[in-house]
Regions:
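Conserved ABC ATPase signature
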Residues: 124-128, 132
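Catalytic Walker B motif of ABC-type/P-loop ATPase nucleotide-binding domains
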Residues: 149-152
């Protein structure tokens, strides 16, 4: 990454779009403190995301992170996978899952309902469909009670209908929980459909930023590329 300058307002649904290897996932890892920039800086609520920063470590649970791999534990139940999300917030170890506070179990049930998985609490994660696994990953992140949700290619390899179901779910959770959502996509059309702002990353540099209101592009900032060329990069018809 080089010369990437992003300013993301609280409550925004912000999409980062780019082809494989462009640096999108690296950006998310920098935001949650998993990586440290060799140059430049990142601030979240005036704090630098760094595991050595004690103040940042205390507020880490406010950043929900969904990796592209989803990170589910395959041989445990949906409920236990979701409860794992609360462990950092409660400063507990995974070994206490069976003695979890009743109020947290009720909160997990509420979130299961929010993500459309009520009645599947005891099902093992490996038995779930691709869309269901993503719902569990979202629920686990929401159990952290975050203010920021980072999601890396959350709908990759899903069909058109399931992709939009998952995106609708995230939008619903964002509104109900007052979240800032920062999501990595490779699909420009999907990003424009759901995000308030879209940044396009190419070879580690931001080459475009778009502001979106409804179906209208209200702000278009770019260097050398036209919007038609950007759309063509991502196999999207700008007329659609």
């Amino acid at each position: 990454l080089e010369g990437v300058n992003l300013s993301i307002d609280r409550g925004t649904n912000y999409a980062i779009v780019g082809q494989s290897g462009s640096g999108k996932s690296t950006l998310l890892k920098l935001m949650n403190g998993m990586m440290t920039p060799s140059k430049g800086s990142i601030k979240i609520d005036y704090l630098t995301p760094n595991m050595n920063n004690k103040k940042f470590k205390k507020m880490m649970h406010t950043i929900g992170y969904i990796p592209q791999s989803l990170g589910l534990v395959k041989n445990i139940s949906v409920m236990d996978n979701i409860l794992i999300g609360a462990l950092p917030r409660l400063n507990l170890m995974q070994s206490v899952l069976k003695q979890f506070p009743e109020n947290e179990i009720q909160e997990a049930k509420n979130i299961l309902k929010l993500v459309g998985l009520s009645g599947k609490e005891s099902r093992k994660a490996y038995m779930l469909s691709g869309g269901e696994k993503r719902r569990v990953a979202i629920a686990r992140a929401l159990m952290q009670k975050p203010t920021i949700l980072l999601a890396d290619e959350i709908v990759s390899e899903l069909d058109h209908v399931t992709s939009r179901e998952i995106m609708d779910l995230i939008l619903d959770a964002q509104k109900k929980m007052n979240l800032t959502a920062i999501m990595v996509h490779h699909d420009m059309k999907l990003a424009l459909e759901y995000a308030n702002r879209v940044a396009v990353i190419k070879e580690g540099q931001k080459i475009l930023e778009i502001g979106v209101e409804g179906d209208t592009i209200v702000d278009f900032q770019t260097g050398d590329l036209s919007i038609e060329e950007i759309m063509e990069m991502h196999n999207t018809d700008p007329k659609e």
